[in-house]
Design a protein with these regions (language model features):
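Acidic, surface-exposed loops and disordered segments
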Residues: 1-217
Length: 217
């Protein structure tokens, strides 16, 4: 499948076939995409919880309550569900861990590169923590960068996907024990193969005209 074909053909699946499983090698490819997702100053303020078992999906489905009950089948019937989570803070331990990994991976060749990277990253963290006071929103933006790559990659692999903000984040955090780990859930993505009940598959894609959303200068 070409990139153009993937962009046009992908859609948010409304019903999954519970009998269909995504092959593990394709899941591994998607995990590699998430692992290598870009983030501002390589901050990597995320964690991904992958539910592949019936028990795991059931735990995540607990968050589809009340106004979000319509999303429960999309979680329970999927092959895999990934909870994209963010850190509650970019603390000293995390910043040191990222810096140490960069050094281990050979990122610092020039003299002073390590100190420069550390200083630059901290300046952005401090900017969002103190001046702009939007550190959680900034971290959340990085998670959505990962989401975009995941959805496009799934389409390229012929995997159907459903991104969901319609869930109770508090319930999911409790079900997965996220908060005691310094994490909170941001968005869910169900992966699998659509069923015949997926009405969205037969509907045309609808976007505003190109001349309304692009400006060339």
């Amino acid at each position: 499948m070409t990139l153009d074909e993937a962009v046009i053909s992908r859609h948010t699946v409304k019903a999954f076939d519970p009998a269909q499983r995504v092959p593990q090698e394709k899941i591994d490819t998607l995990l590699n995409v998430l692992h290598n997702s870009p983030s501002s100053v390589n901050s990597q303020p995320w964690h991904f919880v992958v539910a592949s078992s019936e028990e795991g999906r059931a735990a995540m489905a607990k968050s589809a309550t009340s106004n979000f009950i319509y999303n429960k089948p999309k979680i329970a019937d999927a092959s895999h569900v990934i909870a994209l989570c963010m850190r509650s803070d970019l603390d000293e331990a995390h910043l040191q861990k990222v810096l140490a990994q960069e050094e281990k991976d050979g990122r610092f060749v020039a003299d002073g590169a390590k100190a420069g990277q550390d200083k630059g990253r901290r300046s952005y963290v401090d900017l969002h923590r103190y001046e702009q006071r939007d550190l959680p929103q900034w971290m959340e933006k990085q998670v959505y960068l990962a989401l975009g790559g995941l959805l496009l990659s799934a389409a390229m692999l012929g995997i159907d996907a459903t991104p969901m903000e319609g869930f109770d984040a508090r319930e999911l955090d409790l079900a997965l024990g996220l908060r005691e780990k310094g994490l909170t859930s941001v968005v869910l993505v169900s992966l699998g193969m659509r069923s015949e009940q997926d009405f969205n598959a037969a509907l045309p894609k609808s976007r505003l005209p190109r001349d309304e959303i692009f400006t060339f200068i």
